[in-house]
Design a protein with these regions (language model features):
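C-terminal catalytic subdomain
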Residues: 171-274
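A short, gly/pro- and small-residue-rich
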Residues: 49-70, 169-180, 216-219
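Mobile "lid/hinge" segments at catalytic clefts and subdomain interfaces of large enzymes
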Residues: 41-42, 51-103
Length: 327
């Protein structure tokens, strides 16, 4: 048993380029094995399919093609991320063989119970999972057909990256708050809208597993919250940080680029008028990154209503149980 190491050059194999020029470099041991069995939990249009292989077992040489602010998407419909991953997958099949990869795909009926299991070819099981999800989940644009001046929702102490550790301000506000839970913002927000996130932000960091998250929060975000700029100017810097690469490879830390990719939800700031974080435990943490905050949700709504004037419309988003679980 071992973990995939995206920086272990000796255990990576380059399979070539797709017709669109996407390079594919994957875990050598997995790709050259007689049979690769991959077990996955399908949670949204963002996950499943070839993402398991072409992200989960890939290097930055491959990941850089599709992990971009305009490509990452959770939609069940036309998903550019998975279009690229599928093109890469076709190359993997061509080079490795279509019968050497066996996928077990699961779909949860709630945070604690498996509702459906599929097994077989990657493309087939993903299509089956997508078909079932489309039957049970409305498209976001079908849920509501109007836009609002104020959008408010709570953020749980949950992140797929915080298993066996704790949340930090970056995960709470950006990754979970604007990212995983911010999908409805794209649908219901006006360009002038005020978005209110309620979360008890505190000065709590797990620097062992997230060694450069605090650094990005305190040094990069005060200067810019433009994810395109951050991606362009900081990738090479962190790829050359041998101390952080060592932490990733040998000390169970996230790869130093993980936090850079985690800034992508900040693109929503260009789609709205203002973001306010309500009810932090320690507002100075938000000050250090340049985020606005107030003491309570009530205060945030009162402020936003004064700003937007008469006939202000307010939407409170009720997120599903998958994002509201407690332990």
């Amino acid at each position: 048993m071992f973990y995939h190491d995206a920086e272990d050059r000796e255990n990576l194999v380059y399979l070539g380029k797709t017709p669109s020029g996407y390079e594919v470099e994957l875990n050598k041991f997995a790709i050259e094995s007689d049979l690769l069995i991959y077990v996955n939990t399908f949670s949204s249009g963002f996950s499943g399919g070839w993402k398991s292989i072409n992200v989960g077992l890939a290097s930055w040489r491959s990941i850089r093609h599709h992990h971009k602010p305009d490509i990452m998407s959770m939609t069940l419909g036309r998903n550019l991320l998975h279009e690229i991953l599928n093109e890469m997958g076709a190359l993997v099949k061509e080079k490795v063989g279509s019968n050497k990869i066996f996928k077990i795909e699961t779909l949860l009926s709630n945070p604690f119970q498996v509702g459906k299991i599929w097994a077989g070819d990657i493309d087939t099981v993903r299509n089956e999972a997508l078909s079932l999800m489309r039957k049970h989940q409305k498209l976001r644009r079908e849920i509501v057909n109007r836009k609002f001046d104020i959008i408010c929702y709570g953020v749980p102490a949950w992140s797929p990256y915080a298993a066996f550790t704790s949340m930090n301000p970056f995960l709470a506000v950006i990754s979970t708050g604007l990212g995983y839970m911010g999908g409805m913002v794209n649908v219901v927000a006006k360009e002038s809208s005020t978005v209110i996130l309620a979360y008890p932000v505190e000065d709590r960091w797990d620097d062992f597993h997230f060694p450069n998250y605090r650094e990005v929060w305190e040094k990069i975000l005060p200067e810019t919250k433009d994810p395109y700029y951050i991606l362009e100017h900081y990738v090479e810097y962190y790829l050359k940080r041998d101390d952080l690469i060592h932490r990733y490879r040998f000390e169970f830390a996230f790869h130093p680029l993980h936090v850079i990719l985690g800034t992508f939800p900040l693109k929503k700031l260009k789609q709205i008028g203002e973001l306010i974080v309500a009810a932090p435990v320690d507002g100075s943490v938000l000050d250090r990154a340049g985020f606005s905050w107030v003491e309570s949700v009530e205060e945030a709504i009162e402020y936003a209503m004064r700003k937007h004037g008469r006939n202000t419309t307010v939407a409170c988003i009720n997120n599903p149980a998958a994002f509201s679980r407690t332990f």
